Amino acid sequence: MTESHPDTFCIILLPVPLDRHCNPFFPADLTNHDHACELARLSLAAWRANPERWPEVHERLFSRPVLPPEVAEAAVGQIVGYDELARALEDPWINQILQTGIKDFKQMIFRSGAMPKLVVGDDEVLHGAHRSKEVLLETLERLYRLRD
């Protein structure tokens, strides 16, 4: 959609750790994602240190099994540079972005606990994964009246 309608769509990733250690709004009946708080901080620090390398960091942090924080930090440092990562981890921007994402999550979780969330326009939120890429594209085309 961003390629076929660049003036209509953009993608903004909103980091929200699914872990009550740093996200008090994550539902108590769901299992925390191991190390989500630490990995979210590392991801944001990697973006801050070297945004061009962030996709590689993202893939590494979402690999299985989940990396313990110390191993993840070493892996991210290898990708973006150890000194750059250390400096970025000290940046207050990281906590500001996390708190913004958590605050937005608080508002969205009341409607449905299904993940992921896709915010469309000013007030439409799609909850949960779509059955297929085609179904998602059809939904967006319908919402934005993109069909001829």
What are these regions (language model features)?
Residues 1-74, 146:
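Structural alpha/beta surface segment adjacent to cysteine/selenocysteine redox centers
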